C-alpha cells in the first residue's frame, strides 16, 4: 500500500494570488471535479495505490452557504476551518463542490474516477470530537442527532453522547454554551485556552457497550461510507477512543465490507499491539519511533546506528506500521525546520520506502519539494501547509498541470517515481539490516532486500557529499538469504543525499566482479573478498 495524501481544498485551486486570512472568494478553493481521470491515472502511474482525500466531510467554516446553518466565527480556526471539526458526518464539505447542491453527486463521481484510475479511496473518520456547532442535516431518516437525547444535567452518563460541565458556561468571544461541553483534547471544564481544541466537543464512549448510543451512531457512520464505496478510513486520534469500541466497529464494517482497511493515528507505542490485535486496525502511524528517529538523523545529526533499534522495537508488528515523512500535521521535509532542502530529505525517504514491509505515505507537494513557508492567515510561517486557510499555492497549480514544474521539481518527482517503482519490485521480499556488521557507518544506512539471486544491497547516504564506502556482508546474511555471493566487504559509491542499489551476483573467479551500474546511475566497482 502506497498512499498519496491530498487536500482537495488546495489541490485544484485556480487562483494565482492569496491574501492573508482571505475568504474563499478572495483566495479561491479547489474542487472535487479538479481531480481529472488523467491526473488520477498519472498518480497511479507514479506508483501510488491509494489516495487519501483529506477534509471531505462537512466541517465548521466561516464561509456562509444558503440552506446550511452558519458557524460562529469565534469557534472556527481560520476562514476555511479545520477539516477535523466535523459539522456533519453524513455530508460532504460544500467548499469542495462546483455546485453546492450537487456535492454528493460530485463526491460519487470522484469516487468512481479514482476507482477507474486504479486508486483505492481513503477518507477521514474523526471519532473523538465534533465541531461545537454540529448540525447533521444529511443524516439518513431515523438517525437521532448527536446529543439530542443527552441529560445535560449530568457530567457523565453512559447514555450521553457528550460530557457536560453542569452549571458552567463556555464563553469564547461572542459564542456561549451552557452547560459547557468538554473540549476535544480532554479539557473537562469550561475554560479551554487558545492552544486547546476549543472549537470541538469530545464524544463520550463511556458506555463501554455496543448498545450505547455513541457506539451505535459512530459505527453506523462507518457503515454508511463503506456502503458508498469508500475503501479505507484514516481514523483521527484513534488512541483517544477506547480500543473496545474499535474492536466492535471494525468487526461490524469488515463483516459486510471485508476489503475496507483501517489506519489509526496512534502515538503511544505502548498501545500499538492492543489497537492492532484487539482493536482490529490494519495499520498504525509509526511516528513516535520511526518518523521521529529519521527526522533526528536528518535534522539533528543523530547517528544512523540508531535506526535498527527503532524498527526492532516493532518487529513483531512491522507489516502494520505506516511509514511517512510528511503529513498535514508535520512540518514539510524541505522546510528550514526539517531537512532545509528537498535533496537533503531523499535518503530518509529512501529508507522509509525501501526497508519497510508495511504501507508508505507521501503528502501532496512532497514529491516536488514544497517547503510550507507561507503565512496564510491563521497559520504562520511554520513549515506546514495550512489546513485552516484558503490559499492559492503554486505547488498545487503545478501538480494540477496548470503551471510548469521547474527542472529541479521535475527531477525530484522523477526521483520519487523511480523510488516507488523499486519499492513495488521489492514488495514481499525479506529485509536484512547490515548496520550491526558495519558499526563505523554513522551517516549511511545499509541493508539488504530480496533473496537468492534477486537480493539487492541498498545504501542511503545522509551525508552532503558523495561517499565511497565499504559495506561488510556477514556470513549470516549469506546463509539466511541464500545469497549467490561470498561474505566479505563490498565497495559502493553513493551520491550525496541519495541512495544506491546493487544486485548481488554470483562471485566470479579471483573475487572480482565487473564494473556495473547502480539503481541511482552511479558506476560502482564491487569487490568480493572470498575467504
What does each model-identified segment do?
Residues 14, 18, 61, 77, ...:
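Loop/helix patches that line or flank the sugar-binding groove of alpha-linked glycan CAZymes
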Residues 59-86, 127-192, 277-284, 375-388:
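Aromatic- and acidic-residue-enriched segments that line the glycan-binding/catalytic groove
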Residues 2-4, 51-53, 121-123, 233, ...:
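Hydrophobic faces of well-ordered beta-strands that scaffold small-molecule active sites
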Residues 13, 17-33, 85-104, 199-214, ...:
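The substrate-binding groove and active-site-proximal loops of carbohydrate-active enzymes
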Residues 464-531:
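C-terminal beta-sandwich/jelly-roll accessory domains of carbohydrate-active enzymes
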Residues 6, 53, 89, 114, ...:
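Conserved, mostly hydrophobic/aromatic
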Residues 1-120, 128, 135-139, 150, ...:
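N-terminal structural segment of carbohydrate-active enzymes
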Residues 142-145, 153, 160, 220-223, ...:
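Active-site-proximal helices and loops of the catalytic beta/alpha 8
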Amino acid at each position: 500500500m502506497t498512499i498519496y495524501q491530498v487536500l482537495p481544498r488546495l489541490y485544484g485551486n485556480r487562483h494565482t494570488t492569496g491574501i492573508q486570512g482571505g475568504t474563499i472568494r478572495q483566495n479561491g478553493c479547489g474542487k472535487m471535479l479538479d481531480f481529472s481521470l488523467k491526473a488520477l491515472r498519472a498518480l497511479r502511474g507514479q506508483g501510488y495505490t491509494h489516495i487519501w482525500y483529506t477534509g471531505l466531510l462537512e466541517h465548521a467554516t466561516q464561509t456562509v452557504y444558503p440552506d446550511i446553518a452558519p458557524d460562529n466565527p469565534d469557534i472556527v480556526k481560520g476562514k476555511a476551518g479545520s477539516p477535523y471539526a466535523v459539522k456533519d458526518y453524513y455530508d460532504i464539505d460544500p467548499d469542495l463542490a462546483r455546485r453546492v447542491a450537487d456535492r454528493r453527486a460530485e463526491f460519487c463521481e470522484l469516487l468512481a474516477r479514482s476507482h477507474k484510475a486504479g486508486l483505492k479511496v481513503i477518507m477521514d473518520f474523526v471519532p473523538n470530537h465534533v465541531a461545537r456547532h454540529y448540525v447533521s442535516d444529511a443524516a439518513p431518516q431515523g438517525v437521532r442527532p448527536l446529543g439530542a437525547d443527552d441529560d445535560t444535567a449530568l457530567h457523565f452518563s453512559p447514555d450521553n453522547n457528550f460530557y457536560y460541565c453542569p452549571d458552567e458556561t463556555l464563553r469564547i468571544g461572542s459564542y456561549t454554551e451552557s452547560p459547557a461541553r468538554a473540549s476535544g483534547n480532554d479539557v473537562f471544564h469550561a475554560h479551554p485556552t487558545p492552544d486547546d481544541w476549543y472549537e470541538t466537543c469530545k464524544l463520550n464512549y463511556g458506555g463501554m457497550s455496543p448498545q450505547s448510543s455513541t457506539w451505535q451512531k459512530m459505527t453506523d457512520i462507518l457503515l454508511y461510507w463503506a456502503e458508498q464505496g469508500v475503501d479505507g478510513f484514516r481514523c483521527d486520534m484513534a488512541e483517544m477512543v477506547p480500543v473496545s469500541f474499535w474492536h466492535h466497529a471494525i468487526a461490524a464494517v469488515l463483516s459486510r465490507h471485508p476489503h475496507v482497511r483501517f489506519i489509526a493515528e496512534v502515538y503511544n507505542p505502548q498501545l500499538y499491539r492492543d489497537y492492532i490485535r484487539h482493536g482490529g486496525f490494519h495499520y498504525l502511524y509509526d511516528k513516535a519511533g520511526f518518523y521521529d528517529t529519521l527526522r533526528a538523523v536528518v535534522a539533528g545529526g543523530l547517528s544512523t546506528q540508531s535506526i535498527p533499534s527503532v524498527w526492532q522495537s516493532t518487529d513483531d508488528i512491522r507489516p502494520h506500521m505506516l511509514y511517512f515523512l510528511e503529513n498535514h500535521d508535520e512540518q514539510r521535509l524541505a522546510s528550514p525546520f526539517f531537512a532545509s532542502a528537498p535533496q537533503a530529505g531523499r535518503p530518509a525517504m529512501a529508507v522509509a520506502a525501501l526497508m519497510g514491509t508495511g504501507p508508505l505515505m507521501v503528502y501532496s507537494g512532497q514529491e516536488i519539494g514544497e517547503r510550507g513557508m507561507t503565512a496564510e492567515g491563521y497559520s504562520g510561517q511554520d513549515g506546514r501547509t495550512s489546513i485552516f486557510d484558503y490559499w492559492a499555492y503554486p505547488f498545487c497549480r503545478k501538480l494540477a498541470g496548470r503551471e510548469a514544474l521547474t527542472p529541479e521539481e521535475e527531477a525530484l518527482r522523477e526521483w520519487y517515481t523511480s523510488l516507488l517503482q523499486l519499492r513495488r519490485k521489492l514488495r514481499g521480499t525479506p529485509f536484512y539490516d547490515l548496520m550491526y556488521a558495519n558499526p563505523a557507518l554513522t551517516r549511511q544506512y545499509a541493508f539488504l532486500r530480496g533473496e537468492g539471486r534477486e537480493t539487492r544491497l541498498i545504501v542511503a547516504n545522509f551525508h552532503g557529499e558523495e561517499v565511497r564506502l565499504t559495506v561488510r556482508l556477514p556470513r549470516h546474511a549469506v546463509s539466511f538469504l541464500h545469497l549467490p555471493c561470498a561474505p566479505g566487504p563490498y565497495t559502493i559509491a553513493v551520491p550525496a543525499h541519495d541512495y544506491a542499489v546493487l544486485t548481488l551476483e554470483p562471485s566470479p573467479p579471483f573475487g572480482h566482479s565487473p564494473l556495473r551500474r547502480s539503481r541511482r546511475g552511479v558506476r560502482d566497482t564491487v569487490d568480493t573478498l572470498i575467504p
